[in-house]
Amino acid sequence: MHKTRLALSCLLGSLLLSGAVHAAEALVPPKGYYAPVDIRKGEAPACPVVPEPFTGELVFRSKYEGSDAARSTLNEEAEKAFRTKTAPITQIERGVSRMVMRYMEKGRAGDLECTLAWLDAWAEDGALLTTEYNHTGKSMRKWALGSLAGAYLRLKFSSSQPLAAYPEQARRIESWFAKVGDQVIKDWSDLPLKRINNHSYWAAWAVMAAGVATNRRPLFDWAVEQFHIAAGQVDSNGFLPNELKRRQRALAYHNYSLPPLMMVAAFALANGVDLRGDNDGALGRLAGNVLAGVEKPEPFAERAGDEDQDMEDLETDAKFSWLEPYCALYSCSPALRERKAEMGPFKNFRLGGDVTRIFDPAEKSPRSTVGKRD
């Protein structure tokens, strides 16, 4: 009996120590985020004026306003109003992504300083922290967090340590990311399963990016928990019931669900948490079903109420940016790798920018990743 108690005591102590060590370990991104800054001759473009920090109510019209339950018919008037009101948010998302890509590629200090000036201005004003919002507003909050924290990660973890000379700005920015991340968690927690869809997956990516950028494990843990829920929603054939509700856009929304889930899985694996086995390999099953559906959409049409699938979105190569983390997580076939190379390089500002340079840096386009004008 004494030996049994001693063994149990030792086992408990070992588990507690293991948990403490795990909790103490700093959160890290996938290895591609450690890439050094390339240095080229020349000056950065003049720093544009900072987009007005958005501190007001996050209450916006939905571009699907007036649509039926499938939420698949575009309301052009509402979309125009939405884009006008959210312009400052979209400007900082796209602008930060563009400047970080350009800085990592060309190493011009002006791009780094401009990026930090923009983020610092929004941080100091407490942008995106309002508790007055509607569904479209809280959606914009999590998209913006994923975009900004996702791009910032490349600066924070680069082996060139570009943030070392800007400790105060980095501290303010990261503190702001953590606050926005906490609010995103409040926005998207405790939803009934029937309301958990791609929005929750994108919220998980945003919180994961913020968690790693700020080394806040509660944020990391929440993102992982949302992944568990998402994986549990994938049925045995690789369908997401709540995305099938989008009827003619069911396939497009299954595809749209994959980028954030792949990113969460990639970041989790970098920190010793392998999510690929969740629900008997749900993530791989979902990806395989989407790839098959792109070639033969009839199964999606059948499951979505005999609705012919709208393939317009799927004709845009950038919609498949999830292939980069996918092929880092799984053994992609030579044919799929060749297809990925033909479609890339992939740049998705909502994932923090140039996803190809992060996950498959050998697969670079000969042209600039930020366009000829840059």
From Swiss-Prot:
It catalyses: Eliminative cleavage of alginate to give oligosaccharides with 4-deoxy-alpha-L-erythro-hex-4-enuronosyl groups at their non-reducing ends and beta-D-mannuronate at their reducing end. CDD domains: AlgLyase. GO terms for cellular component: periplasmic space. Optimum pH is 8.1-8.4. GO terms for molecular function: poly(beta-D-mannuronate) lyase activity. Its main location: periplasm. It comes from the Bacteria. Gene3D superfamilies: Chondroitin AC/alginate lyase. The keyword Lyase applies. HAMAP family: Alginate_lyase (MF_00557). Belongs to the polysaccharide lyase 5 family. This is Alginate lyase. It comes from Azotobacter vinelandii. The gene is algL.
